[in-house]
Amino acid sequence: MPSVQAPRLEPGGDPAGGLGTSAATAPAAALPEWCPAWAERLGDAYLSGTSCVFLLHGNVRDLVPIAAPAAAAADPAAWGTVSDFLAREMFGRWDVVLAYDVGKGLRPLAGPDPNRLRTMAQWLTERIGNAATWPRDPDQAVAAIDAILERNLIDPPEQRKRIAVVLDYAQYLAPAGEAGSRSAASRLVRILGWATNPLLRRVNVAVVLLADTISEVHPRLVQNPAISAIEVPMPDAAERERFALA
């Protein structure tokens, strides 16, 4: 029996094949039952046009299903990280999924598709140089992401890319209590700028921050109405059993 693929967030596509036609007007399409509830909340928030920046917090380190139950029960590879799920399912048809954390630096996320990975890497190389020079420093990395998003805005519409950004360990990018330092304040202001930029909400851009504990993230991000904070809960008994059988 073939696995059921989750509808991807696809603002430029057909609602029947993805989650709507535009960030502002598309109706939300129901995700399959096997998809996490937090994913449906993220999709609904994006498609409503109220936000393009999201903060996933809580149980963001557990493996999550990235295939239908029939497949996941027999294949451990049908489970992946939250970042895997975002790259393969939520943004599986987007042109670029760019991830960053302070440990691994900037990198494209393309799931298991090598052709998609090469295409992403080539496009990113044209924008920010050879992969060997991509910044690991958080200030430089956030500045590079900002430059990518700004360049995408001024590109002709037919050349614009659908870009998703996944910022893991967000508590180290915008930590609570550290906005007094110049570098931390700069990163915070850039992220807030993405959330409140009406132009970004009109093109195909989504930024997802992952944090283990919401209290460790700067309150300016947590409390901003333009940022959708979504809790990722601990798995229930049925989910734990499903994983144990994989």
Label every PLM stretch briefly.
Residues M1-A246:
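ATP/nucleotide-binding catalytic cores
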